[in-house]
Amino acid sequence: MRIGIYPGTFDPITLGHIDVIKKSLKLVDKVIVATSYNINKDYFFTIDERIEIIKRSLYKDLKLNKKKIEIISFDTLTINLCKKYKAKIIIRGLRAVSDFEYEFQLAGMNKKLSNEIETVFLMSDIENQIISSKFVKE
């Protein structure tokens, strides 16, 4: 079974995130949507609220397959999460070229930490690319 981890804060989840999740289901058998807590960020929603919003968005509203999508929280390195769940793919969404520099560096660091885990970049559809969680909160 090919397992992918889609890490993020998802504060809140956006249509762009959902688009990336749907596209990733074409590449892997199971996607683990992993919402994290970063002490350097100010959050609008608690971790439990974010998980509930993600579940409602994916399972109830969109009726996506619960067997193919697992929603968890985590507070460790993404690489450690991949090893725990035997995931070989880290899924990252890109909205614009401005996202690429940071994501490229992150993918390089993850590759150094574990050569067997690949990072896959997915673009959301154009109508969802300009929406960030920051703007949804505002």
For each predicted feature, which ranges?
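Nucleotidyltransferase catalytic core that binds NTPs
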Residues: M1-E138
